[in-house]
Amino acid sequence: MAIYVLKPFDRNFKGDMIADIKLCLAARELIAGQYEASLGGGVYKKRIPLGAGKSGGARAIIAFKSQKHLFFVNGYAKSTTKSGIREIKEDELNLYRQVASQLFAMTTEQERAAIKARKMREVICDG
């Protein structure tokens, strides 16, 4: 199983790039069933600490299906969302589910082409 980060995820954290080791930890936790919300269609919401604890950290939208790869699709800093308002709108959620379905259907050749085109990058985790 490979772990990939899509370009929108990295772009949203351009100034506060999240270290790959934190992405690996978040991926391991999600695979172990530790996540904030299952949003359906293989889409999950996961908190990632940015140094000041998880409550003030980042939120990742992750596509994962058992026996498939894991994709960090999008993300945002918790501080950018207003409290009391739904963080992910229904139309965004439907789009994430569609994207997840397309990602799960990718062939190895399509994955390589996406990496070469810099649409996503692979994260290498130790152990």
Language-model features, listed with the residues they occupy:
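Generic alpha-helix signal with a bias toward terminal, lower-confidence helices
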Residues: 15-16, 21, 25, 30, ...
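Basic/aromatic recognition patch in beta-strand/loop cores that engages polyanionic ligands
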Residues: 34-81
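Enriched for short, Lys/Arg-rich terminal
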Residues: 64-127
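Arg/Lys-rich, positively charged N-terminal/basic patches that mediate binding to nucleic acids
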Residues: 1-18, 112-127
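Charged, alpha-helix-enriched surfaces in structured cytosolic catalytic cores
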Residues: 4, 56, 91, 95
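N-terminal first-folded block
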Residues: 3, 7-49
